[in-house]
């Protein structure tokens, strides 16, 4: 199945902004994150604009957005 | 900080001043001080621009010390924008300098009969209040440029631009940064209009010959400050995200969350958000050779600010903050960072709040004055404010006045003050704060965006009402206390996530005063401030019916989540039950 992965802030450096990936059914957010060796902890995860946990199982057509901890205001 | 300067601008024969012992206000700083004086001394039914109102300027209780991040200055009054009590704070140099001069507060009282314009100069030798009509009609940048030739290099300036002189309801008070640029503003609630009504154009603070305020227990203080800074540096938000990208790192986050108010709160997602995001902004700034990390005041270790330059490397403005990029950007359908930077400069120069001004432009777009996305049109509209045309005066009075004049229903304000860059339908926690804070819609009064969206300081579902009242209550209490210390509110991220950093701050305050401070003391301080503010607002005529969002937030679902604000009125009325 296909999922769109989006990276933000420091996670983009040396990687990508947006990438469409082919992943096997049953792939979780963790599976995607673990393969990328991101610098620092993952702070915020959205799947289709809703907050998700690392164990969340992705579905075909999902958009996964991954942020480090960021803040401002 | 053992004295208070009171300047009677309305005294017969011209302004007079007196320096009093701090007396009953001893130990208070920042918001605790401004709120205590306003609530005790200002008639709640007074006209905010009349002689009965007072403008109180107070450094934080830790300002002027070696404590990192302690450079916030609070300004308080009865707000001409909201009609309630107001505390608006800013960075820049003023807090540190005023605190070293030993003043716990400056109180501007009365108003002159004549049309003369005044400046107030304060240094170690005393106070000078003088007429300077050559400053009339000067915007903030040329004003500070003209003044700084006349004073010591160490001076800090608090000024009003043309908007303040015109007493526009969104007028700000500018504070100069370490490079003496008028870039840090007490923006919210029209404090600049109150200073303008008192005919004070500039306050010049010079701490030449003075030293940092010494702590009672220097060794403990130094150790606590070290642990405090360590905590800020190791937290990913204050140690990495903010220095690298500034506050605008939030554009992509809120847009991904579907909570980014777009085209005057019509949708929660802006298709061109990426173009004005912090990531793109930082890349552009580095490419153009601007200064990539910069502190708004000396002693800041987060350094979230930046100097924004144009394609030729020429100074435009300080890095527009997230709320400004949103207000003038996505909120108006504008996706050009250079346009937004120009608008930020114009706001700072004329001296208006970027949020209420951006929201007013969004409402004007809704009314059809110019289309959404029209950057050149937005610049023209904001230039009208500087010119003082009838249209400019309307816009410079903020979103609510603009909505009334142009017959717009969708006006995102509470108690007359514009909301910030988070839609309260898709971040319900911030909706509770917007609705109930004493300040009018103010995201900083209880930043529930942290636990709702950023997953800092807790974890709540932003699309559900559960837990939001309690979270907003606790944050409003904590914020009122932090706003009294002079500390930048960004310390709240590590404070809430790292108990040892919170303890370091308690130890630092304790060591400064030679006391032992606990978390309960902080909570008690926060509650006492909110209680005074609520009491003032009640006496000014506010009821629970003012603690509500505009009805369209309850009636119009916002895409992409198609939700309305779901916290009930009964629950909103529980925020201050503790």
Predicted feature residues:
Chain A
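Ubiquitin-like/PB1-type beta-grasp interaction modules and other compact soluble beta-rich domains
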Residues: 1-72
């Amino acid at each position: 199945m296909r999922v769109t992965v989006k990276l933000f802030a420091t996670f983009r450096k040396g990687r990508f902004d947006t990438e469409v990936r082919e992943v096997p059914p049953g792939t979780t957010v963790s599976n995607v994150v673990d393969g990328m060796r991101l610098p620092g902890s993952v702070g915020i995860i959205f799947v289709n604009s809703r907050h998700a946990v690392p164990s969340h199982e992705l579905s075909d057509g999902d958009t996964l957005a991954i942020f480090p901890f960021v803040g401002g205001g | 900080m053992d004295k208070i300067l009171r300047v009677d601008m309305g005294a017969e024969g011209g302004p007079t001043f007196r320096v009093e012992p701090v007396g009953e206000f001893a130990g208070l700083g920042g918001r605790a001080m401004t709120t205590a004086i306003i609530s005790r001394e200002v008639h709640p039914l007074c006209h905010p621009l009349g002689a009965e109102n007072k403008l109180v300027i107070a450094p934080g209780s830790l300002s002027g010390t070696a404590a990192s991040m302690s450079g916030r200055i609070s300004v308080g009054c009865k707000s001409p924008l909201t009609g309630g009590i107001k505390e608006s704070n800013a960075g820049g140099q003023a807090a540190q300098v005023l605190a070293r001069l030993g003043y716990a507060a400056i109180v501007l009282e009365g108003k002159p009969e004549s049309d003369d314009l005044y400046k107030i100069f304060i240094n170690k030798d005393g106070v000078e209040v003088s007429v300077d009509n050559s400053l009339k009609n000067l915007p903030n940048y040329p004003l500070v440029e003209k003044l700084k030739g006349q004073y010591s290099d160490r001076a800090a300036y608090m000024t009003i631009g043309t908007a303040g002189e015109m007493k526009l309801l969104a007028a700000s008070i500018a504070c100069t940064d370490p490079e003496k640029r008028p870039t840090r503003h007490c923006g919210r609630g029209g404090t600049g209009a109150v200073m303008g009504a008192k005919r004070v154009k500039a306050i010049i603070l010079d701490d030449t010959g003075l030293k940092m305020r010494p702590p009672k227990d220097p060794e403990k203080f130094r150790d606590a400050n070290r642990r405090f800074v360590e905590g800020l540096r190791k937290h990913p938000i204050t140690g990495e995200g903010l220095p690298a990208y500034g506050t605008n790192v939030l554009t992509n986050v809120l847009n991904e969350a579907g909570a980014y108010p777009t085209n005057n709160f019509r949708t929660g997602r802006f298709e061109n958000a990426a173009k004005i995001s912090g990531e793109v902004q930082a890349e552009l700034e580095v490419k153009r050779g601007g200064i990539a990390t910069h502190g708004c005041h000396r002693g800041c270790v987060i350094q979230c600010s930046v100097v924004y330059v144009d394609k030729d490397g020429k100074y435009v403005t300080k890095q527009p903050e997230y709320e400004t990029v949103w207000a003038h950007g996505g909120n108006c359908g504008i996706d050009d960072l250079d346009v937004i930077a120009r608008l930020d400069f114009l706001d700072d120069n004329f001296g208006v709040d970027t949020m209420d001004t951006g929201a007013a432009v969004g409402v004007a777009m809704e009314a059809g004055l110019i289309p959404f996305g029209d950057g050149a049109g937005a610049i023209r509209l904001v230039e009208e404010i500087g010119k003082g045309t009838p249209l400019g005066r309307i816009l410079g009075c903020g979103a609510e006045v603009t909505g009334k004049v142009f017959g717009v229903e969708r006006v995102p304000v509470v108690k007359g003050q514009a909301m910030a860059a988070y839609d309260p339908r898709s971040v319900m926690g911030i909706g509770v704060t917007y609705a109930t804070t004493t300040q009018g819609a103010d995201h900083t009064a209880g930043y529930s965006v942290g636990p709702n969206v950023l997953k800092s300081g807790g974890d709540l579902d932003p699309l559900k009402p559960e837990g939001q009242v309690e979270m907003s209550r606790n944050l409003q209490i904590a914020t009122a206390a932090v706003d009294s210390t002079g500390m930048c509110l960004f310390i709240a991220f590590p404070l809430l996530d790292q108990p040892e950093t919170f303890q370091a701050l308690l130890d630092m305050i304790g060591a400064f005063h030679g006391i032992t401070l606990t978390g309960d003391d902080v909570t008690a301080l926060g509650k006492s401030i909110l209680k005074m503010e609520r009491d003032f607002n009640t006496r000014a005529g506010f009821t629970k019916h003012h603690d509500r969002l505009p009805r369209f937030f309850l009636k119009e679902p916002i895409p992409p989540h198609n939700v309305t604000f779901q916290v009930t009125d009964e629950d909103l009325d529980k925020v201050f039950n503790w």
